[in-house]
From Swiss-Prot:
The keyword Acetylation does not apply. It comes from Dictyostelium discoideum. One of its GO terms (molecular function) is structural constituent of ribosome. The keyword Ribonucleoprotein applies. It holds the Pfam family Ribosomal_L18A. It comes from the Eukaryota. Belongs to the eukaryotic ribosomal protein eL20 family. Keywords: Ribonucleoprotein, Ribosomal protein. GO terms for biological process: cytoplasmic translation. PANTHER family: 60S RIBOSOMAL PROTEIN L18A. This is Large ribosomal subunit protein eL20. One of its GO terms (cellular component) is cytosolic large ribosomal subunit.
Length: 171
């Protein structure tokens, strides 16, 4: 299921003591709005002394990319729990959208570090200029004269019958 970006707004339930409680807003990456609300309560309980039973969700909206046809560089600050402890990491990705960059990050963290989505906390994600990129993997695409190999350009017509026997010996 693809990842979407949500903005979740919530607060404490108003009481006689506090008629206008403080409002909290978070931008979260999740597959569904239900999962985003769940992550909102998870992070809010870590930051403020509040939980789902004493709070209310005011609004959940999906955030869409302004220019989804333009390739951008994204810097992602994350914190994740591994078998040996908690680590802070900065990673860079090139993608069309923030959600695409986060999907790349989740795939890479799962393959390289065996870190699952539940153990990864995205602290910040920013669109960064080409001059501010740090990683060589991202910088290699900033060349204006970059060339890629164009493979299998000639379409070869295959005949119905072939004059020689098939080769079954492969090294």
């Amino acid at each position: 299921m693809p990842i979407h970006e949500f903005q979740v707004v919530g607060r404490h339930v108003p009481t006689e003591r506090d008629a206008n409680p403080k409002i909290y807003r978070m931008r979260l990456f999740a597959q569904t709005s239900i999962h985003a609300k769940s992550r909102f309560w998870y992070f809010l309980s870590k930051i403020v002394k509040m939980k789902k039973s004493t709070g209310e969700i005011l609004n959940v909206t999906e955030i869409f990319e302004d220019k989804p046809q333009k390739v951008k560089n994204f810097g992602v600050f994350i914190r994740y729990n591994s078998r040996s402890g908690t680590h802070n990491i900065y990673k860079e990705y090139r993608d069309l959208t923030r959600c695409g960059a986060v999907s790349q990050m989740y795939d890479e963290m799962a393959s390289r570090h065996s870190a699952r989505e539940s153990s990864i906390h995205i602290i910040d994600i920013k669109e960064i200029a080409a001059s501010l990129t740090r990683r060589a993997n991202t910088k290699q695409f900033h060349d204006s004269k970059i060339k890629f190999p164009l493979t299998h350009r000639i379409a070869k017509s295959k005949s119905t019958f072939v004059a020689n026997r098939p080769n079954t010996f492969f090294c």
